[in-house]
């Protein structure tokens, strides 16, 4: 449904205004939204969390941190979901919601934060796809003729082709089922081969490595990665695709995401760390031993799943460009195809260039969590809910929301410093366009 500032009766005696958009909204079931959210949690990024979360935090910090991050993220996301129709208007974009509550400056600031967040996530997906593509190449031809930047460029091209072919988020349809199958392939392979290696291996070292100062920075950076694990930074955009009753249906999708949806991720993260300890790679499939064809299948699945996931996280950017330039009607019309080739192709080209320039995946996770996920998902969500529902909250609830705002603001600053330090160190150890 393409809508243009019209009023929609939701069957509860309330008229809800729907903003203009070139993309389809109000057409998906809560289950499809749940699959979009679950795809984000179980994307190929899960192959990195054993190395980027568990190694810096250890068993106690990693397990407790992931469980706490799950609970806190569920709470923060429910706050945003409940505000979707606040004030009699459907807020189909994160910036629309912030602007409605705070005003124009907050609208612009949220827009910048969100798009930086999504851009860095998408750079990470391109790095992931390129790394997996390189892993397949090395399995069969380890001659170093092709370097990581070459594989990142190929991955970017694949992402661009997919972006041109799928016009909007709701059009993913069957691709969400494909994404789930792909996720299961690399997760099952990683778990089975890790268990096989772990049973055979001698005792592992689970100590957190480094000096006290470096431990402090790596632990802080890992805390930012923890919040990156569970949060999309685009919940209103996903909720926009859901049928009425939109809040009730989105709550179902969130409960599915944070119960059933997190189980595969927990399994691969904990088993991977158990098998390899402090030597766990930021890309788990680089650690596992097994038949070449099995490892190749897992890596190819990770490549293709990253392409689908990138399209999900790039969809708010695509929606803005399509709406701004009035790209509506038949997606296969020549005008619309040419526009997607130019606009989306250009966006992915820039993302690919940055990914090849600085291919430090763990650092991207930490920096994204620090500068975007903390502010968007925790600071903004708590304060927006406090401001919107101020008259309905008791003193204790108000105090809790303010404590959350202050705590996560401090965490955001600390994590950003830690992430920038990691990037600076990696930049000294590796040149640009590094072959990691």
From Swiss-Prot:
Please give the chief subcellular localization of this protein.
Answer: membrane
Q: Enumerate the transmembrane spans.
A: 29-49, 52-72, 118-138, 151-171, 172-192, 216-236, 254-274, 296-316, 345-365, 366-386, 405-425
Subcellular localization: Cell membrane
Tell me any Pfam family this protein matches.
Aa_trans
Q: Which InterPro entries match?
A: AA_transpt_TM
Q: How does it sit in the membrane?
A: Multi-pass membrane protein
What Gene Ontology molecular function terms does this protein carry?
A: L-proline transmembrane transporter activity
Q: Which GO terms describe its biological process?
A: proline transport
Name this polypeptide is given: Proline transporter 3
Q: Which family does it belong to?
A: Belongs to the amino acid/polyamine transporter 2 family. Amino acid/auxin permease (AAAP) (TC 2.A.18.3) subfamily.
Q: What happens when the gene is disrupted?
A: No visible phenotype under normal growth conditions.
Keyword annotations from UniProtKB, A to Z: Amino-acid transport, Cell membrane, Membrane, Transmembrane, Transmembrane helix, Transport
- Function of the protein: Proline transporter that mediates proline and glycine betaine transport. When expressed in a heterologous system (yeast), imports L-proline, glycine betaine and GABA across the plasma membrane.
Expression by tissue, per the entry, reads: Expressed in epidermal cells of leaves, sepals and petals.
| Gene Ontology CC | plasma membrane
């Amino acid at each position: 449904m393409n809508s243009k500032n019209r009023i929609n009766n939701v069957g509860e005696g309330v008229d809800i205004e729907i903003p203009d958009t070139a993309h389809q909204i109000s057409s998906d079931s809560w289950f499809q939204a749940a699959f979009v959210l679950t795809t984000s949690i179980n994307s190929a990024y899960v192959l990195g969390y054993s190395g980027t979360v568990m190694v810096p935090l250890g068993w106690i910090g990693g397990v407790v941190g992931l469980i706490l991050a799950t609970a806190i993220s569920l709470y923060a996301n429910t706050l945003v979901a409940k505000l979707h129709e606040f004030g009699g208007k459907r807020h189909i974009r994160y910036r629309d919601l912030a602007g409605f509550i705070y005003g124009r400056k907050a609208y612009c600031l949220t827009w910048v934060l969100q798009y930086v967040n999504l851009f860095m996530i998408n750079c990470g997906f391109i790095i992931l796809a390129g790394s997996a593509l390189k892993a397949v190449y090395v399995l069969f031809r380890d001659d170093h003729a092709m370097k990581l930047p070459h594989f990142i460029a190929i991955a970017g091209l694949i992402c661009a082709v997919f972006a041109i072919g799928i016009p909007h988020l709701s059009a993913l349809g069957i691709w969400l089922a494909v994404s789930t199958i792909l996720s299961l392939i690399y997760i099952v392979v990683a778990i089975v081969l890790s268990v096989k290696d772990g049973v055979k291996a001698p005792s592992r070292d689970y100590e957190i490595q480094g000096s006290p100062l470096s431990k402090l920075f790596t632990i802080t950076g890992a805390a930012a990665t923890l919040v990156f694990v569970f949060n999309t930074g685009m919940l209103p955009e996903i909720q926009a695709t859901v049928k009425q009753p939109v809040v009730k249906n989105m709550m179902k999708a969130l409960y599915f995401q944070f119960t059933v949806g997190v189980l595969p991720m927990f399994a691969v993260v904990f088993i991977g760390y158990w098998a390899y300890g402090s030597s766990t790679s930021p890309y788990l499939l680089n650690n596992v031993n097994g038949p070449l064809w099995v490892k190749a299948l897992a890596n190819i699945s990770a490549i293709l799943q990253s392409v689908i996931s990138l399209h999900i996280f790039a969809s708010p950017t695509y929606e803005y460009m399509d709406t701004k330039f009035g790209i509506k009607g038949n997606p296969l019309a020549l005008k619309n195809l040419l526009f997607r080739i130019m606009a989306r192709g250009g966006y992915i080209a820039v993302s690919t260039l940055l990914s090849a320039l600085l291919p430090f995946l763990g650092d991207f996770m930490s920096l994204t969590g620090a500068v975007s996920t903390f502010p968007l998902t925790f600071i903004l969500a708590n304060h927006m809910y406090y401001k919107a529902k101020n008259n309905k909250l008791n003193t204790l609830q108000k105090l809790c929301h303010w404590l959350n705002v202050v705590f996560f603001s401090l965490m955001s600053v600390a994590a950003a410093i830690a992430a920038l330090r990691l990037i600076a160190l990696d930049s000294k150890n590796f040149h640009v366009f590094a072959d990691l």
